[in-house]
Amino acid sequence: VTSRELAVMLSPLGYRKLSATDGILRGEAVGASYPVFHNSWRDKRATHEIWVGVSGFGKTFGLNCYLTREYAENGIPFDMLEPMGHGKHIADAFGLPWYVMSAKATKLNPQDVMFPTLIEQVSHVTRIYETVLGRSLSGAQRENLERGLLGEALEILYRGFPDLNKVSPELAPTCDVVCDVLSGLGDKEATKPIAKNLADEIAGLCTGSGPWAEFLNGATNVDLSRGGRERIEPRVFSFHELESDPILQALAYTQVLSAIRRDSLIDEQPRIIAVDEVYRLMRHPSLLDFLIEAAKTFRTRRKKLVCVDQSRANSRRVVAHLC
């Protein structure tokens, strides 16, 4: 290409690529001097990426282009999580399922099994309830007791199943069942009221007419399971209808990422997990910890994590934990 004008005229045909050039088009050098190609799949382990830029600089558009090229040229499927509804464009382009999370129509049960061991699963559910409660269940004596009691209630429920990994969303215990079991725990006079009060607090938020009951209390109605498939096609998850409630949005991000992480353990097929506006998870420290833990799993299973954010400070926090 000898001029920018000619490049614009030929843009529908794409860039010419030398046979020795490996990878797909990722963008242009500064000043549009030359195209940049990159192959993310040379190594057995995936390479994660963090994109940073202020609003309006084309991060989301660039992400759509990247996912489109990887899928169209290399057949690399992806899971896209985005908060603004722009995912509809890429879903329409490929005829993909577009999952829109809604406070009124969506249910995501916190007790859905996302981890292979009981200890990991209980820790995951506890993290979700910490986010719902807006406080940590550790540190001081009372909080430590609350954490132990909640963990005991969850263990009682999960031990009722012979195989944890075969607990389907239809069988997973719901929030009201957790509260019922929790309210009856405590082997000493001092711990009984703590268990009862914690159960009442969770029930007031997640059951009955609680602010998050419609979203959290019930069987999950979004298909997040692998369902015996050898390959999962690309999926697009949009969270724009949860924009008014940042806690619900963060919880939805976490449950979807948890399901993706769970399925990533099964095979080493290359896949891209793209999380747009990752700062929405970073508002909640326990959920940020989960993202960092998941990223380490993704890499060893050839799953590339692409985090898109507006804050360089947030990105440094993620990089510091992954390096």
Which sequence ranges carry the predicted segments?
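Hydrophobic anchor at the beta1->P-loop junction of P-loop NTPases
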Residues: W51
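A short helix-turn-beta junction within AAA+ P-loop NTPase domains corresponding to the substrate/partner-engaging
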Residues: L96-V100, V318-C323
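P-loop NTPase motor domains
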Residues: S3-V36, R42, P83-K303
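Hydrophobic positions on the alpha1 helix immediately C-terminal to the Walker A/P-loop
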Residues: G62
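Sensor-1/coupling segment of RecA-like P-loop NTPase cores
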Residues: F298-S315
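The conserved Walker
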Residues: S55
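Conserved lysine of the Walker
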Residues: K59
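Post-Walker A helix-loop "phosphate-sensing" segment adjacent to the P-loop in P-loop NTPases
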Residues: R69-D79, F94-L96
